[in-house]
């Protein structure tokens, strides 16, 4: 794993040293277009995931279903360190909420901003309302916006509490929610594991796009988060089977038509 992460850091260095300056010049001449950096990131992510697969560490099957065609808020569970990379690779024109601490440590702040990503609040220079406004702006520009309701990786073999932020974002933006379910067995570097201790054997990852959902009505975001969390727990086998209280057509608008 040390060698692999060395390659990962080398890729970041080359992106900062070569790719970012080239795209900066192109953006100065032709005008800024986040899709250029997103396209570059998707290529680099694809190479990294191919390397993990080739080393017998992590592999993923073909996703089940398709994401909603237009602007939406994408929400998901987060069982492992790299599941988000599959989503970045497979879902085009998607902005992502990125931990500001991670962006500073690598350092990738200019790359993420160039790609149209939004940095998470640090409660010092950036508050949650500023991040919310930036996310709404991205959605109104035509992007899908990806965020994790747990706000961090899931506990090993479990699921964290869903917060209401993503569902408030969907309501304020007046766009559908696109829930997707990630099953990772065994979890590849979950929250409790050290990055230098990969799981024994191949970790397999499956992604399932659920039916899009209309956003909650005003004041119902917390209840919506609680109910959707229960649905994920049921899918993970963490609670007794029960009928979900969530329906694709419940909300404050017309039921969105899912992509086929």
Predicted regions and their residues:
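Conserved H-X4-D acyltransferase segment
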Residues: 3-8, 44-98
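Alpha-helical membrane-embedding segments
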Residues: 64-81, 107, 130-133, 139, ...
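A short acidic, often aromatic-flanked loop/helix-cap motif at beta-alpha or helix-coil junctions
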Residues: 67-69, 103-104, 124-128, 213-219
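Short amphipathic alpha-helical segments and helix-helix/interface helices
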Residues: 49, 87, 109, 135-136, ...
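A transmembrane-helix-recognition feature enriched in membrane-embedded lipid enzymes
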Residues: 1-61, 110-111
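Catalytic core of membrane glycerolipid acyltransferases/transacylases, capturing the structured
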Residues: 23-40, 72-125
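Non-catalytic C-terminal accessory region of glycerolipid acyltransferases
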Residues: 129-260
């Amino acid at each position: 794993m040390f060698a692999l992460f060395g390659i990962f850091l080398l890729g970041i260095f080359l992106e900062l040293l070569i790719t970012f300056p080239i795209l900066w010049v192109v953006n100065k001449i032709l005008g800024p277009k986040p899709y250029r950096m997103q396209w570059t990131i998707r290529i680099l992510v694809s190479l990294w995931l191919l390397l993990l697969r080739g080393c017998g560490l992590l592999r993923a099957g073909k996703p089940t279903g398709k994401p909603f065609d237009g602007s939406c808020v994408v929400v998901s569970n987060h069982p492992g360190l790299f599941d988000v990379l599959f989503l970045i690779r497979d879902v085009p024109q998607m902005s992502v909420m990125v931990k500001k601490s991670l962006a500073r440590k690598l350092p990738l702040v200019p790359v993420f901003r160039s790609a149209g990503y939004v940095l998470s609040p640090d409660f010092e220079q950036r508050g949650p309302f500023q991040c919310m406004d930036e996310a709404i702006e991205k959605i109104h520009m035509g992007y899908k916006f990806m965020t994790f309701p747990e706000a961090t990786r899931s506990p090993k073999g479990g699921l964290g509490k869903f917060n209401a932020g993503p569902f408030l974002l969907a309501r304020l933006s007046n766009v559908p929610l696109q829930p997707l379910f990630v099953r990772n067995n065994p979890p590849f570097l979950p929250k409790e594991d050290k990055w230098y201790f990969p799981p024994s054997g191949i970790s397999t990852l499956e992604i399932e796009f659920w039916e899009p959902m209309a956003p909650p009505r005003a004041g119902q975001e917390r209840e919506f988060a609680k109910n959707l969390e229960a649905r994920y727990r049921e899918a993970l086998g963490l609670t007794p089977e029960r009928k979900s209280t969530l329906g694709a057509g419940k909300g404050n608008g017309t039921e969105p038509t899912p992509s086929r």
